[in-house]
Amino acid sequence: MTLDISKYPTLALANTPDELRSLPKEVLPKLCDELRTYLLNSVSQSSGHLASGLGTVELTVALHYVYHTPFDHLIWDVGHQAYPHKILTGRRDQMPTIRQKDGLHPFPWREESEYDTLSVGHSSTSISAALGMAICAGKEGKDRKVVSVIGDGAITAGMAFEAMNHAGDVHPDMLVVLNDNEMSISENVGALNNHLAQVLSGSLYTSIREGGKKVLSGIPPIKELVRRTEEHLKGMVVPGTLFEELGFNYIGPVDGHDVLELIKTLKNMRELKGPQFLHVMTKKGKGYAPAEKDPIGYHGVPKFDPSHHSLPKSSNTKPTFSKIFGDFLCDMAAQDPKLMAITPAMREGSGMVRFSKEYPSQYFDVAIAEQHAVTLATGMAIAGYHPIVAIYSTFLQRGYDQLIHDVAIMNLPVMFAIDRAGIVGADGQTHQGAFDLSYMRCIPNMLIMAPADENECRQMLYTGHQHQGPSAVRYPRGNGMGVELESSFTALEIGKGRLMRESTACEGEKVAILSFGTLLPNALQAAEKLNATVADMRFVKPLDEALIKQLAQTHDVLVTLEENAIAGGAGAGVIEFLMKEKQLKPVLNLGLPDQFIVQGTQEEMHAELGLDGAGIERAIRDYLAK
């Protein structure tokens, strides 16, 4: 449902940055108020990321007002905070479709708009990309400006500091804006600091500073005195020493909710040469009290009524796989004081809130540092402890070298609890857990498990925790099947699947479906129509070779089913084994195709990709008809 824009008269005048830049500065505070209200009303009707965008309204308006986008390049890190940017860049009327199938992309996306310079979704990539663009902008000589906006969480990642270190070396004209919404230094925000930002970014101060450097370059003692005096002045009111040491001219912190002061500072900084760093203080959830009070809860929201000041409770009473994992941690830690749980900034999403409170000394949130998380676990395993790394499938990609070099080569007992495996839904291409089976299956020493339901997940987590080598349990986003959970733990026999249904077909081609993971109910649904055998394979590595040989000998066609890329996945492993054994048999691999999977609900995407019950049946019938 599109909102009535007549209720937002100032915002109606700024459908594009060109229109925004034509407005007098005096109306911009009113524009920001309307934009914030529009964002709240829009997201509450459609679902999406809310708190981050509420906090970047003034910053977004100021950036588009000062910089000549899209000629100037504006890059948003991750993209959760870019909803105001989408609204101001010609996509206002499409906002009700965001994160929905065939709708607006949840993050800045190059194919969607010329204003989206970089397609994003994962954190900490913006400064590297901005640096590359800034270097090339300097070579083309058209006075193109490049700006990267990065949050205080994303900037903690090593990649961001690698980029800043390089930028300080090559010294291009670029601006990094730190959107700091943690309020850790809020006492430094105010009139004095805004005034200092004006002075330090102003042309007079900059000219004196740069001119003085040239004049005094031959007099090291005096040059050093000037440098130390400047640092002392700035150090009294700003925490920018680190960024100065990396080669940036640091300005801030400034009030990120004073749009007119932001514009003054940005106009000054636009004319400065070399790498610039602007530290902006914002409040996540700004303007909507519940989101200000609970920015984590209002980070991503379902549809809700803003007047109720609370989010609706899920009507699904079945536990999520994330909760199954979190409860396992607590139950296991009660038995094992050497259990150590590690997460790269995904406490809530991975279901670890309860564990972090009940076992704080065994809980480690390493921030957005996937590489470090994996090798931290290595050190703990070497020390004789039992580390578990809780990580999303798409983010484990960022720690792949560490998985091989620091865990698997030494055959260390580190378990990876891989959440969001398979189709994740509304976050689209950057967040689908499409590749983990493919990129792990080729690693020696790995034990890889794919549960069909929540109880199997619980027992596999226990199995992995007991295993004396690297292991992984991969499970999807969302709720379980509603099966009864066994309170006791039972280690599964490694590499053994189980038959769930046996075909009674006496004529025609006999089919066996080998299911890996939570698509098992869909396989059983299709099997009822086809009178097919179904096996819950459980283990991707090692495969249940005896079961595969048995099914190959007693069936005419084998079908593998997985919520992973077909290329290199579990089905590929089945074919490799059959070829090795000279068991030449027709095999149909069903899974994710060779493409990046777009956004949509899990149910919508399963249907579109032919992985629901009807789609599996259809694919098998088509294969048999060939």
Curated annotation (Swiss-Prot):
<dbReference type="Pfam" id="PF13292">
    <property type="entry name" value="DXP_synthase_N"/>
</dbReference>
<feature type="binding site">
    <location>
        <begin position="121"/>
        <end position="123"/>
    </location>
    <ligand>
        <name>thiamine diphosphate</name>
    </ligand>
</feature>
<dbReference type="Pfam" id="PF02779">
    <property type="entry name" value="Transket_pyr"/>
</dbReference>
<keyword id="KW-0460">Magnesium</keyword>
<comment type="subunit">
    <text>Homodimer.</text>
</comment>
<keyword id="KW-0414">Isoprene biosynthesis</keyword>
<feature type="binding site">
    <location>
        <begin position="153"/>
        <end position="154"/>
    </location>
    <ligand>
        <name>thiamine diphosphate</name>
    </ligand>
</feature>
<comment type="function">
    <text>Catalyzes the acyloin condensation reaction between C atoms 2 and 3 of pyruvate and glyceraldehyde 3-phosphate to yield 1-deoxy-D-xylulose-5-phosphate (DXP).</text>
</comment>
<dbReference type="GO" id="GO:0005829">
    <property type="term" value="C:cytosol"/>
</dbReference>
<dbReference type="InterPro" id="IPR029061">
    <property type="entry name" value="THDP-binding"/>
</dbReference>
<keyword id="KW-0808">Transferase</keyword>
<dbReference type="GO" id="GO:0019288">
    <property type="term" value="P:isopentenyl diphosphate biosynthetic process, methylerythritol 4-phosphate pathway"/>
</dbReference>
<dbReference type="InterPro" id="IPR049557">
    <property type="entry name" value="Transketolase_CS"/>
</dbReference>
<dbReference type="InterPro" id="IPR020826">
    <property type="entry name" value="Transketolase_BS"/>
</dbReference>
<dbReference type="InterPro" id="IPR033248">
    <property type="entry name" value="Transketolase_C"/>
</dbReference>
<dbReference type="InterPro" id="IPR005477">
    <property type="entry name" value="Dxylulose-5-P_synthase"/>
</dbReference>
<protein>
    <recommendedName>
        <fullName>1-deoxy-D-xylulose-5-phosphate synthase</fullName>
        <ecNumber>2.2.1.7</ecNumber>
    </recommendedName>
</protein>
<keyword id="KW-0786">Thiamine pyrophosphate</keyword>
<feature type="binding site">
    <location>
        <position position="80"/>
    </location>
    <ligand>
        <name>thiamine diphosphate</name>
    </ligand>
</feature>
<dbReference type="GO" id="GO:0030976">
    <property type="term" value="F:thiamine pyrophosphate binding"/>
</dbReference>
<feature type="binding site">
    <location>
        <position position="181"/>
    </location>
    <ligand>
        <name>Mg(2+)</name>
    </ligand>
</feature>
<dbReference type="GO" id="GO:0009228">
    <property type="term" value="P:thiamine biosynthetic process"/>
</dbReference>
<feature type="binding site">
    <location>
        <position position="152"/>
    </location>
    <ligand>
        <name>Mg(2+)</name>
    </ligand>
</feature>
<dbReference type="GO" id="GO:0000287">
    <property type="term" value="F:magnesium ion binding"/>
</dbReference>
<feature type="binding site">
    <location>
        <position position="288"/>
    </location>
    <ligand>
        <name>thiamine diphosphate</name>
    </ligand>
</feature>
<keyword id="KW-0479">Metal-binding</keyword>
<dbReference type="GO" id="GO:0008661">
    <property type="term" value="F:1-deoxy-D-xylulose-5-phosphate synthase activity"/>
</dbReference>
<comment type="similarity">
    <text>Belongs to the transketolase family. DXPS subfamily.</text>
</comment>
<dbReference type="GO" id="GO:0016114">
    <property type="term" value="P:terpenoid biosynthetic process"/>
</dbReference>
<dbReference type="InterPro" id="IPR009014">
    <property type="entry name" value="Transketo_C/PFOR_II"/>
</dbReference>
<feature type="binding site">
    <location>
        <position position="370"/>
    </location>
    <ligand>
        <name>thiamine diphosphate</name>
    </ligand>
</feature>
<dbReference type="Pfam" id="PF02780">
    <property type="entry name" value="Transketolase_C"/>
</dbReference>
<dbReference type="InterPro" id="IPR005475">
    <property type="entry name" value="Transketolase-like_Pyr-bd"/>
</dbReference>
<keyword id="KW-0784">Thiamine biosynthesis</keyword>
<feature type="binding site">
    <location>
        <position position="181"/>
    </location>
    <ligand>
        <name>thiamine diphosphate</name>
    </ligand>
</feature>
<dbReference type="GO" id="GO:0052865">
    <property type="term" value="P:1-deoxy-D-xylulose 5-phosphate biosynthetic process"/>
</dbReference>
<comment type="pathway">
    <text>Metabolic intermediate biosynthesis; 1-deoxy-D-xylulose 5-phosphate biosynthesis; 1-deoxy-D-xylulose 5-phosphate from D-glyceraldehyde 3-phosphate and pyruvate: step 1/1.</text>
</comment>
